[in-house]
Regions:
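Extracytoplasmic
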Residues: 58, 68, 117-119, 128, ...
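Surface-exposed, charged secondary-structure patches
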Residues: 87-144
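Bacterial N-terminal signal peptides
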Residues: 9-20
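Short, low-complexity N-terminal intrinsically disordered segments enriched in polar/charged residues
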Residues: 22-69
Length: 175
């Protein structure tokens, strides 16, 4: 005969409840639409399109205009494997690199190379005042993947439009 302790008996007693309890799952877009923020979501998607177009056009001025002017947080965080490779090349390599959107806009404006970022698996959350956007990316230079990872933007809605306040991304350059 099988003997069960009190913990096992409690777990068995709760099993039917656990198996029948269902939590509704909604996508970010469904949640936002239900909360009345569909127009904000569309405006944020427009910021992403403008970002992409500015990079393709080497337009650092337009790119800079998408960011909150006083915001400077731009973090590039190497993945563990990328950091290990970087340390082999330079023992003083940094895992977290701090920069700002102005430096990126300057690079976009001055490089003769062709930049083309690809974004996928977009997840967006907003309350109509602040927002976070999370996506996977591949950053192509002259048609070749130069970097990949995940990226998050924190955005704020000012009196006139949505602006990126900070950018944080993981970085896995090709080997």
């Amino acid at each position: 005969m099988l003997k069960l302790n009190n913990l096992a008996l409690c777990a068995l007693a709760l099993l039917p409840i656990a198996l029948t309890a269902q939590t509704p799952v909604t996508s970010a877009a469904q949640t936002q639409t239900a909360n009345g923020h569909r127009a904000d979501e569309a405006a944020i998607e427009q910021v992403m399109k403008q970002y992409h177009a500015a990079i393709l056009a080497h337009d650092g001025t337009t790119l800079s205009g998408l960011f909150l002017p006083d915001a400077n947080l731009w973090l590039n965080v190497l993945t563990d494997s990328a950091y290990a490779r970087a340390q082999v090349k330079s023992p003083t390599a940094r895992k977290v690199r701090v920069s700002n959107y102005q430096d990126f806009a300057k690079l976009v404006s001055t490089t003769p190379k062709s930049f083309d970022p690809e974004h996928s698996n977009l997840v967006m959350h907003t309350d109509g005042t602040i927002a976070v956007v999370y996506f996977d990316f591949v950053f192509n230079i002259d048609g070749k993947a130069n970097n990949r990872g995940s990226e998050t933007w924190q955005l704020v809605k000012t009196t006139d439009s949505w602006h990126v306040a900070s950018t944080i991304y993981s970085s896995e350059p090709p080997v």
